Amino acid sequence: MTYTASVVGGSGFTGGELLRLLDGHPEFELAQATSRSKENKTIGHSHPNLRHSDLRFSSPEDLESVDVLFAATPHGVSMEQIDAFQEAAGTVVDLSADFRLESEAQYDEWYDGHTRPKLLEQSEYALPELNRDNLEGADLIASGGCNATATILGLLPLFEADILSGDEQIVVDVKVGSSEGGAGGGEASSHPERSGVVRPYAPTGHRHEAEIQQFLGIDVSFTVHAVDMIRGASATCHVFPEQRVSKGDLWGAYRGEYEDEPFVELVAGGGGVYRYPEPKSVAGTNRAEVGFELDPGNKRLVVFSAIDNMMKGSAGQAVHAANVALGIEETAGLEFQGLHPVGAP
């Protein structure tokens, strides 16, 4: 069976990744892409890798009826347009933060409130490794934040294996590429200002903390740095377990959680150049790399995870979740394994 799909907000970076994935997906027919600023231009005008397509951007006011609508719009748009989205499609996958959290109180604390709070309990978080069963048949799906996704994937096995209880001190440092700022950018995203930086841009209070709290049930000390790469999110989690932990315990926890997951790979101190997770290794793919190292002298466990922020942290996660929701093979349209060697991701 072939499902029709549309992308609302298709001219941005994440929208472009959605268009790329859907264009090559064996079970989706890309029916529409909207952009207010690029209306009537071909999608290749914004995304040169899609110049082969004749599809043109249409107005977001003229939504066509499709099976699945992917919304790659700024925060606040989807909650205002959700009625139109759901009228146009049986399944809506939102890539903004509008439906990620479970309660109105959380949006009051972390964002600027929510205009459609009754829909929050109907939404399902899009990370299949965390929420697969609830995604099956879901009609409103919220793709997770890239920094939260990297952190959750790194820490989840430790909680599932009861290595951590939630009372431990956990310090998370995330380094992200410039594409996280979107195609619109701003002064801080211009090449002269961004090139060569290791810039703390959210030392405390990053909104993705709310997702980590919600799904792992913990508070973390969370800091995000902007670094000189285009794609990628790399999370380094410093954990101080209350109990003694061995390498065997860790291998058992991570293999037990991820051995059957098609998009998560364990990379933990092996040979070669790429001994631990790196964004460069997963650029352009829906894969996540997860690894760890023990520091027994300081009673510390260091957990690493790396994803492409626009793929596993956004568009790839969204398509993966849609596959699960519709009963499509999970890896469909997401088989690309990346390139090596490559330049800065």
From Swiss-Prot:
The active site is at residue 146. InterPro entries: AGPR_type-1, LysY, NAD(P)-bd_dom_sf, NAGSA_dehydrogenase, Semialdehyde_DH_NAD-bd. One of its GO terms (cellular component) is cytoplasm. It catalyses: [amino-group carrier protein]-C-terminal-N-(1-carboxy-5-oxopentan-1-yl)-L-glutamine + phosphate + NADP(+) = [amino-group carrier protein]-C-terminal-N-(1-carboxy-5-phosphooxy-5-oxopentan-1-yl)-L-glutamine + NADPH + H(+); [amino-group carrier protein]-C-terminal-gamma-(L-glutamyl-5-semialdehyde)-L-glutamate + phosphate + NADP(+) = [amino-group carrier protein]-C-terminal-gamma-(5-phospho-L-glutamyl)-L-glutamate + NADPH + H(+). Keywords: Amino-acid biosynthesis, Arginine biosynthesis, Cytoplasm, Lysine biosynthesis, NADP, Oxidoreductase. One of its GO terms (biological process) is arginine biosynthetic process via ornithine. Disulfide bonds: none annotated. Residues 34-56 are annotated as: Disordered. Its EC number is 1.2.1.103, 1.2.1.106. NADP(+) binds at residues 11-14, 309. Pathway: Amino-acid biosynthesis; L-lysine biosynthesis via AAA pathway; L-lysine from L-alpha-aminoadipate (Thermus route): step 3/5; Amino-acid biosynthesis; L-arginine biosynthesis. One of its GO terms (molecular function) is NADP+ binding. It is found in: Cytoplasm. Belongs to the NAGSA dehydrogenase family. Type 1 subfamily. LysY sub-subfamily. Involved in both the arginine and lysine biosynthetic pathways. NCBIfam families: argC. This is Putative [LysW]-L-2-aminoadipate/[LysW]-L-glutamate phosphate reductase. It comes from Haloarcula marismortui (strain ATCC 43049 / DSM 3752 / JCM 8966 / VKM B-1809).
